[in-house]
């Protein structure tokens, strides 16, 4: 936790908008949420990773962003990406969100190809994932490729989508 707290402060000091940190399912697994728009979001993610590696060095530990750093019956490491546009946030409808999800399903294979190496080890259909070769979406469905948050539905379909397919080692410029 000390590393996570120091990392959070280092990112904030660097002008990177982190919106939270939390411990995850696997032992020693931590998550942080990075907020940004477009290319700035990708830039900030790379800098935040760099800061995390440097801080971990000072503690004599290593950071591992492999999608499944240890095989077994537990969750892997993903880089879930929330996204929205102005229409989704202010004039959304169930039809709009369904159409967007269907369009993402049409290019599922292309997305998977860009979402990080060894992602097949994580996207097995178990441990809050959809199988790498299948596409699905649903409200509050952590086992779907695309999760529609309850927040979005409760706010008259105004909100965002969460792409749960990218792995922790993904290149944010490709995603």
Question: Could you describe each region identified by the protein language model?
Answer:
Residues 1-175:
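Glycine-rich, acidic/polar active-site loops that bind/position phosphate-bearing ligands
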């Amino acid at each position: 936790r000390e590393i996570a707290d120091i990392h959070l402060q280092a990112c904030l000091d660097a002008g990177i908008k982190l919106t939270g940190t939390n411990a995850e399912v696997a032992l020693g697994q931590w998550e942080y949420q990075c907020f940004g728009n477009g290319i700035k979001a990708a830039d900030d993610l790379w800098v935040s990773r760099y800061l995390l590696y440097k801080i971990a060095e000072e503690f004599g530990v290593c950071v591992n962003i492999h999608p499944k750093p240890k095989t077994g019956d537990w969750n892997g490491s993903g880089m879930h990406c929330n996204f929205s546009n102005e229409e989704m946030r202010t004039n959304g409808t169930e039809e709009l969100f369904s159409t967007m999800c269907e369009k993402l399903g049409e290019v599922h294979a292309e997305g998977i190809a860009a979402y990080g190496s060894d992602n097949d080890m994580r996207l097995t259909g178990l441990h809050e994932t959809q199988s790498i070769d299948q596409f699905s979406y649903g409200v509050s469905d952590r086992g779907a490729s695309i999760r529609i948050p309850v927040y979005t539905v409760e706010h008259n379909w105004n909100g965002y989508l969460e792409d749960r397919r990218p792995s922790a080692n993904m290149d944010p410029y490709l995603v």
